Amino acid sequence: MSLSTEAKAKILAEFGRGENDTGSTEVQVALLTAQINHLQDHFKTHIHDHHSRRGLLRMVSSRRKLLSYLQRTENERYNALIQKLGLRR
């Protein structure tokens, strides 16, 4: 249920600050958002998959913490990221 290498490369190119940037907050949030969206589609067909649902909740919590950090430290980058990803906060 992880993302393909091509999907990750596309996200890195779009949200990365440099060509080898894999750890910036924006990239981490974008990757988590893509995985969360993928899992949401999975749960539409596999309603009783509770083990994966726990993983989804961990990802959502991790993304929330990263977004809180970004909002606290660099509000302009936070607002741009929220708008680009279409998240509501």
Swiss-Prot record:
It comes from the Bacteria. One of its GO terms (molecular function) is structural constituent of ribosome. GO terms for cellular component: cytosolic small ribosomal subunit. GO terms for biological process: translation. PROSITE patterns: RIBOSOMAL_S15. SUPFAM superfamilies: S15/NS1 RNA-binding domain. One of the primary rRNA binding proteins, it binds directly to 16S rRNA where it helps nucleate assembly of the platform of the 30S subunit by binding and bridging several RNA helices of the 16S rRNA. Forms an intersubunit bridge (bridge B4) with the 23S rRNA of the 50S subunit in the ribosome. Part of the 30S ribosomal subunit. Forms a bridge to the 50S subunit in the 70S ribosome, contacting the 23S rRNA. This is Small ribosomal subunit protein uS15.
